[in-house]
Amino acid sequence: MSKRHRLDLGEDYPSGKKRAGTDGKDRDRDRDREDRSKDRDRERDRGDREREREKEKEKELRASTNAMLISAGLPPLKASHSAHSTHSAHSTHSTHSAHSTHAGHAGHTSLPQCINPFTNLPHTPRYYDILKKRLQLPVWEYKDRFTDILVRHQSFVLVGETGSGKTTQIPQWCVEYMRSLPGPKRGVACTQPRRVAAMSVAQRVADEMDVMLGQEVGYSIRFEDCSSAKTILKYMTDGMLLREAMNDPLLERYGVIILDEAHERTLATDILMGVLKEVVRQRSDLKVIVMSATLDAGKFQIYFDNCPLLTIPGRTHPVEIFYTPEPERDYLEAAIRTVIQIHMCEEEEGDLLLFLTGQEEIDEACKRIKREVDDLGPEVGDIKIIPLYSTLPPQQQQRIFEPPPPKKQNGAIGRKVVVSTNIAETSLTIDGVVFVIDPGFAKQKVYNPRIRVESLLVTAISKASAQQRAGRAGRTRPGKCFRLYTEKAYKTEMQDNTYPEILRSNLGSVVLQLKKLGIDDLVHFDFMDPPAPETLMRALELLNYLAALNDDGDLTELGSMMAEFPLDPQLAKMVIASCDYNCSNEVLSITAMLSVPQCFVRPTEAKKAADEAKMRFAHIDGDHLTLLNVYHAFKQNHESVQWCYDNFINYRSLMSADNVRQQLSRIMDRFNLPRRSTDFTSRDYYINIRKALVTGYFMQVAHLERTGHYLTVKDNQVVQLHPSTVLDHKPEWVLYNEFVLTTKNYIRTCTDIKPEWLVKIAPQYYDMSNFPQCEAKRQLDRIIAKLQSKEYSQY
C-alpha cells in the first residue's frame, strides 16, 4: 500500500523521480550501516571468544610450567599483564610485551616469563624447552636427597651412570646451594679429565642456565681460559685446578669442588684428591664431591674417611654383544668393514659409534668410510661421518650432537657415524647411538723409570672400559655392540680396571707442582695408590739435574718459576734458560710448536707431495729448527689458510701454536724475562738456539756408535732416528724430544748438537765418575781433558 502510494506521489509531482532516487540511496546507506554494525558485533564476539581461549591456554600453560618449575625447585610464574592493561603496566613490562609480540608472530602462545637471576632478564623460550628435557634426566629424582647430603656432609661420593645427567645438573644445584648461603658468594669448580668434555659441557650448561658462555658459566683448559670475573661455575681440566692451587693453596675462591670422572684415575685427579683431602681439614666451609661413572666407589669412600655414597641409576636399555670368532689381524680394517656392513644391512634406524686410538687413525678411518660409502652408489642411505678427539676446535666437537641425514625416498636409512677416541666412553653422551664398534684398544701412557722412557702405547682396554663402551649403545633404546676381539680374550686377557695413571707416568711435573704447593714430604703424601719409589726418585733426580730442586730436595727460585709454566719441566727450563743465549723469541716459537698436535699433514693419497713440501722447510741441523722455519713462514704469509693447504700444513695446529706462544710470552713478562733474539746474520743465531735446547734436554741425547746404530747416553738403549725426521745424515750426537716405542725404538724430533755443549751446560749430569762404559764415555772423557787443558777456550 505504502509502496503504491509513494509511486502515485511520484507520478503526481514532477520532482518525484529525483526524490525516489534519494530515498533509495538512504535505504542502501542504512542497510550498509546495519551490516557493518552486525559485522563489528560478530568480530567483537569472535575476539572475545579467542581471548577467552588464549586466557585458558595461557592458564593451562602457566599451570604446566609452574608444575615443571616447582618440581625443579624454581619459583612459580606470576600471571602476565593483558594486552589491554594500563599504560604504566605496559611500560613496566615493555621487554616482555615486545617478546610476546614476537612470539605471537611466530605462531606461539605467549609464555609468562620469570626473571633469570643471573642476567635479570626474562628467561628465553629456549630455556623452558631445555628445562623440559632436563627434568626427564634420571638425576632429577634425586635432587632432594643430593641437597640433603650436600648440606649435612663436607665430602661425599656420587656414582651415576653415563647419561644420568650428573655432569650437567649437579654443578648447577651446587650453584643454587652456594647462592642460598649468607656472606660472600664463592664459586663452583667441576673438573674433567679431558679438555673436550670441559668445553662441550660448559657450553651445554651455559645454555641450560640461559647465560653466555664465558660469563656466569666458563671453562679453563691448558692454554685457553674462557671465563670472567662474573663466572660462578667453571668447568676445567683437573690439571688446571691443580695449577690454580699453586697460587691459591686453599682454593678460597671455590665453595664446592666436584671431581668428575674420578674413575678414570688420571694423574692430576689422583693428586687433586690428595690435595683436597688436606684442604678440607683446613676449610670447614669447603664441599668436595667425587663423581664416578662406575660402581667401584668403595675405594673413594674409604679414602675420604668413609664418606657417604649417593647412587643414581642410569636409564639404560639391553645391549646385545657380538664377538669375533677369531682375533682380527688388522683392527682398523675390520672396524671400517663393520661400519659399512651395519650401514647397509641393519634394518633399524640408529647411529654408529666407533672407538679408535688417536687422531691419525680417526682421520684415516673417516676418509675411508666416506670413500667406500660413496662408491656404493645412490641406492644406499646417506652417511654423516664425524671425528671426535681432544684437539678438535669446540665448534667441530659440537657436530656430534647434530641429527643424522634423513631417509631417502627408497627407504634407505641415513646414519651418523661418530669416530672417537675413548673420550666418548664416559665423558660425553651422544644420543641416538644404537650400534657401537669396539676394537678393544686405546692409547695409554706407559713409563719405564729404569730407562726413563715415557711413551703413548696402543694397549688393550680393561673390562671396565669395554663395559662402558657397550653401554653407549643402550642409551635411547636397545642396541648392539660389536667387539672386534674374541670372548676368550675379554674373559681371560683383559684387566678388570684401567691401571691408575700415577702408576705408569713420569712424575717430574707432578713432583714440581707438589713442591710448589709446599708439600715437601712426598713419601708420606696421601696418594690413593702410591707410585713406585723408583719413579719418585727418578722425578726428584730429573728436577735436581735441571736445578729446579737443590741437593736437599727443596724448590729453588728457578724451580718455582718453572712451576708457573704449563709445560714439562724440560721445556720450562729451556724457555727460561734461552734468555741467557739471546734466543728466547725463537725458543718460545719452538716450544709452542712442540706443545700442539703435529703440524705436518701427510694424506695417504698425496704422501710424496707432502714429503716434498716438508723438505722445503727442512733445516740441516734437524727437526726443532725445521719447526721454527714453519712458524716463521706461517707468520710471514699472514697466517693464510690457503698457504697452509698448499704446503700440507695443519692450519689449526699453527693457530694453536700462536695462541700458546702468546700465553707463554705473558708468563715470561710476568717474571721480567727478556724476550730477545740473536741477529739473524750472526753465525751464532742457530748455535745459540741449539745450546738453549741442550739446557732442557741434555738428559735426552743419543750417540752414533761405530756399528751404525744410536745408543742413548747413560741408559744405553739401542734406538733409531724416526722416519719422520728431516735429518738427511746421521749426526754423531743428537738431542731428541721423545722416545717412541713401536716395533722398534725410535727417537723423534731430533737436532744435531756438539758434545762440548753437554759437558759445559750440564757438568753435574755429565760427571764421568758415574757414567757407564761406552764409546760416548770415552769420547766425552777426551773432550773434558781437552777443555781442562785449556785447548778449547771457546765452545
From Swiss-Prot:
TM annotation in the entry: none
Modified residues (Phosphoserine): 15
Compositionally biased tracts (Basic and acidic residues): 20-62
Keyword match Amino-acid biosynthesis: no
Domain Helicase C-terminal: 338-518
Activity regulation comment: ATPase activity is enhanced upon binding to G-patch domain-containing proteins. G-patch domain-containing proteins act like a brace that tethers mobile sections of DHX15 together, stabilizing a functional conformation with high RNA affinity, thereby promoting the ATPase activity.
Expression across tissues: Ubiquitous.
Residues the entry annotates as binding ATP: 160-167
Short name of any one Pfam family annotated for the protein: DEAD
This protein's record includes keyword Acetylation: yes
Biased composition (Low complexity): 79-108
SMART domains with a match to the protein in the record: DEXDc, HA2, HELICc
Family: Belongs to the DEAD box helicase family. DEAH subfamily. DDX15/PRP43 sub-subfamily.
Protein name according to UniProt: ATP-dependent RNA helicase DHX15
Species of the source: Homo sapiens (Human)
Gene that produces this protein: DHX15
